Amino acid sequence: MKPSMITRTVTGTISGYTVTKETTMKQIDTAQLDITACQAQAAEYHARGFNCAQAVACTLAPAVGLDPQVAFTLTEGFGAGMGGMTETCGAISGAVAIMGFVMSDGMENPKTKGQTYKLSREIAKRFGEKNTTTVCGTLKGIGSDKGPLRSCPGCIDDAVEIACDVLKQLAE
C-alpha cells in the first residue's frame, strides 16, 4: 500500500513548536483519528499480545497510509521500554514512529528529521506532563514501593490521544 501524498507548505505551531514542512507529506485521514475509537483499537491490539509500541503504531497506521503489518514489524523491538530495558515507554515510541513516517521525505532528503524531532519532543513532553515521566520502568513502578504510576493500557491510551491530536493539527 503506497501512502497518499500531498505537496504543500505546512507551517504551524503545535504547543509552542513551530513545524514547517515544505515538501511532500503523507496525507492524514483525520476521519480515522477519533480518539475513543483509536483507544479501543489499541486496547484490542494490546490484549491480543501486541507490545505498547505496536498497539499505538498499528492503530494510527491506517490514518497515515502505512500498512499496519509494516508498523507492527518496525516497532517490535520498542516494547517494554526499548527491548525490555524499561527505558522510554513503548507507547511513546510507537507514536514517534508514526510521526517519522508522516514527516520524512525518505533517504533522498534526510533534512526533514528536524521537524520529526520537534513532533517527537512534543509527544514526549505532553506524555511526561500527564504521567510525570516517560520512563517505562518508573511508570510500571519497578523498584518502587509505591507501585505503578500508570498501567500499560493507560500509557497506550495517553499516547494515542496525544498522537491523534498532533496528527489532526498537522492535517489542518
State what each model feature region is.
Residues 24-48:
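Polybasic, low-complexity association/targeting segments
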Residues 94-102:
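DPxDG-like acidic metal-binding loop motif
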Residues 63-74, 101-119:
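Phosphate-handling active-site elements
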Residues 26-32, 59-77, 130-137:
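Acidic-glycine-rich active-site phosphate/pyrophosphate-binding loop
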Residues 40-47, 78-86, 143-149:
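A short glycine/serine-rich beta->alpha loop
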Residues 86-94:
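Conserved phosphate/anionic-ligand binding catalytic regions in large, soluble enzymes, centered on
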